[in-house]
Amino acid sequence: MQKAHGLDIRWLGAKDLLKVVPDLEPDGLIGGTFSPGDGSVSPMLATHAHYRQAKRLGALFQFGEKVLQVLAEGGRVRGVRTDKGTYLAPAVVNAAGPQARELARAAGTDVPVVPDSHEAGVTEPVARFLEPMIVDIRPGEGSANYYFYQHRTGQIIFCITPSPAIVGTDRRETSEFLPMVSRRMLGIMPKLRNIKVRRTWRGLYPMTPDGSPLVGRCRELEGLVLAVGMCGQGLMLGPGLGKLLCRLVTDRLEPGDRETLEQLSPYRAFAGVERLK
């Protein structure tokens, strides 16, 4: 299916996989998929680049304001009221991430999005030795999967998916995370043993019942558009969804957009488990 959509991905047996990542533990290694065109991006730098370009195109940013209410009249959006003022607009996009449900309720509606805590960490910089991101989708004690990669600065960035999920807004680091992820990482790449960890942190994923985003118009309030529940894939999905939302809000949908919106409809029947990891 991935190849049918143009993705360059292939299965490599253990011997060929070790040619790509020589430092993998060979004992018990069967193989894995490899996508040479994959990469990573700095969320901070990417966000700032989008911010600067948006300003060049005339976008106005208001930082440090909390939306208290989505204003409506006659079943249609009129704008938003914040703790610092009122802004009138014919359309409001709910893209509030883990706070999506809170904002939806400020509009008198609801969305099935809950915040899910995930922890990550970063090491000291070391000489370059790792090219692709390593993703281990095998479940382990306390975790569903984990990944790590080497940043261009030489630091190793790593994250784990807790199992069961930790629902809530607690962003405090835990004492369980580092020992758990270290055991798993060293199990497949012993070379990491002596690298020092600089810091860990905890953030929130906005999760939906089936692990796919909720994108489309709100039926209960005309002019309210939903772009919520990216489930940890927001940075990857953002550019494409941003263009789709622009076309949706301005009534300029292209062929194929309606099929995408149907698949991501906030009103779809939720079945199965999370598909995106």
Describe each model-derived feature in a short phrase:
Residues 76, 86-89, 96-222:
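Active-site substrate-recognition segment that forms the wall
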Residues 32-53, 97-99, 177-184, 230, ...:
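Mid-domain beta-loop-alpha active-site segment that forms a flexible
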Residues 186-277:
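C-terminal catalytic lobe of FAD-dependent flavoproteins
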Residues 1-20, 145-146, 166-167, 176, ...:
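Dinucleotide-binding Rossmann-like beta1-alpha1 core, especially the glycine-rich loop
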Residues 45-56, 108, 190-191, 247-250:
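Oxidoreductase and adenylate-handling cofactor-binding alpha/beta cores
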Residues 33-90:
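Helical element adjacent to the flavin cofactor pocket in flavoenzyme catalytic cores
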Residues 1-16, 26, 111-113, 252-259:
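A short alpha-helix-loop-beta-strand transition element characteristic
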Residues 13, 63-65, 199:
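Short loop/edge segments at beta-strand edges and connector loops
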